[in-house]
Amino acid sequence: MDIYQSTIRPILFSGLKTDPEWLHNRTLGLLSWLSSNQKSTLGHWVNGQLQQRFCLNDARLEQTLWGVNFPNPLGLAAGFDKNGVAAGIWGSLGFGFAELGTVTFHGQPGNPRPRLFRLVEDKAALNRMGFNNLGATAMAARLEQLKVNRLQVQPPLKVNRLQLQPPLKVNRLQVTGLEKNLPEEKAKGEQPTGRERQGRTTFNRIQASGLTIPIGINLGKSKVTPLAEAADDYRSSFGLLRELGDYFVVNVSSPNTPGLRSLQDATQLSLILDALQQENVSQKPILVKIAPDLEWNAIADLLELAQTYGLAGIIATNTTIRRDLLKTQRIAATGKPVTEEAGGISGAPLRQRSTDVIRFIWQETQGTLPIIGVGGIFTAEDAWEKITAGASLIQVYTGWIYNGPWMVRQILQGVLQKLEQRGMSSISEAVGSGSG
C-alpha cells in the first residue's frame, strides 16, 4: 500500500466537510516539513518514497526554454504554494517545474474567510483568496536558504535512466553529507536497451536539500499600493527575488484584487513591464498571466506589447469570472447563489476557453512566443489538447486537488503514449501540432 492510500487520502477524504482552506494549509504544512527536512533520516526516506511513486523521467518529455531545462512539461500552477514553503519538494511529486506565489511586496492577509469553495458537481473551485501571502522579503529569505542547500551541478550530471533493482553496482556521490546511489554509466560503445533508451522507468534523481526543478515566481500587486504606483510595487518584489527564480510572472489577471485586471490594459501594463525590464539585469524570463475573459482584440494588443518589451511568454489563463457554464447553483458553506459569490472559477469549466486562448496566441504569433497553458487539466487528454493547441508547458492545481498526487505521473504516461502513437520523438514536436 502506497503512502497516498495509507496516509494522505484518508486525511483528505475525512476532511472533505471542513473548510477547504484549512485542509489545504494542513497539507501544505506537511509538504513544508518534508521540504525543510530532507537531510533528516525520515525526510530522506520519505522523499525517496515519493520519487519512486510519483516521478516519471523520460528524455522525450524534456525541453529547454529560455535556457532553462524542464524535465517534463507538467508544472504546479501558482496559488498552491504562495510563500514557497514547500519549494524543495515539488520535484519529488513528479512535477517538471513549480510556480510559487502569488507573492506581493507587502505581506497581506487576503480577503475574509471563507474564501475557497469546492464545486464538486463541476469539478471546479471558486476562490477569492486575495493574494494572501507573507510578502516578497519572507519568500526571498526562504528561497535563499534553499539556494544554500541546492546541489551545485552545472551542467546537470547525466545518468542513465536505469530501473533501480538489485543487484545493481552503483557509484557513491557525496551530497551535502548524504550519500546518494547513482547507476554506473554503461561502458563506452555499449548500446542501451530499448527500455532504457525510452526511459519509461524512473531513476533516482540527484536530490539533496534544495531545489531540483525550475522554479517560477508569480508577482502580484500589494492591495495597499495604489494602482498608479503598481509598477514600483512589482519592481520592488522582482528586485528582491530576481536571483531566486528561473522565470517570473506578472499577474495582472486575478479577479480578487480590486482594479487589478485593469492593469491588463496596454498602457498600464507597459509601465509595469518597462519597470521590470529596467530591473532585469540578469535577463530573467518574464511572462504575463492573462485572464480568459479578455476579448480577442485585447489579447492581440497584449501580444504586441509582449513583443515590444521582449517578454519570454504568456501564461494562459487565470481563473474566470463567468458563471454561466456551472451546474452548481448554490454555495453550501454560505447559502448564497453561486452567481452572487465573488471570486474566480478554476477547474473543468475553464478547460475549453483556456485552450481556445492558447490556440489564438499560437496562431497570432506563429508559434514564436512560448505559452504555459493552464485551466481544466485533469487527464492526459486535457494535457494533450493544450500542448497541441500551442502550450510548450502546462500547469495543474484544481485537477491535482481532485485527482490526487498520482495524477502527475498518469498524465505524463498518457502524453508519452500519445507521442508513441503519432511517431513523435519529443514533446516539442507536439507543441502546436493541432493549431496549424
Segment roles from a protein language model:
Residues M1-L151, T212:
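N-terminal capping/small domains of soluble enzymes
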Residues H44-N57, V252-D265, Q307-G367:
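Glycine/Thr-rich beta-alpha phosphate-binding loop at enzyme active sites
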Residues A78-D81, N218-G220, I290-W296, G367-E381:
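Glycine-rich beta-to-alpha transition loops that act as phosphate-gripper elements at the mouths
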Residues V85-W90, L294-A306, F378-I394:
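Catalytic cores of alpha/beta
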Residues E99-F105, G313-I321, W384-Q410:
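Glycine-rich phosphate-binding active-site loops on the catalytic face of alpha/beta enzymes
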Residues G110-K123, L325-E340, I401-M424:
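C-terminal helical cap(s) of enzyme catalytic domains, especially alpha/beta-barrels
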Residues A124-L126, L134-T137, R142-L146, R150, ...:
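Alpha-helix-loop-beta-strand connector modules within alpha/beta enzyme cores
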Residues S222-Y234, S262, V288-Q307:
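Active-site glycine- and acidic-residue-rich loops that bind
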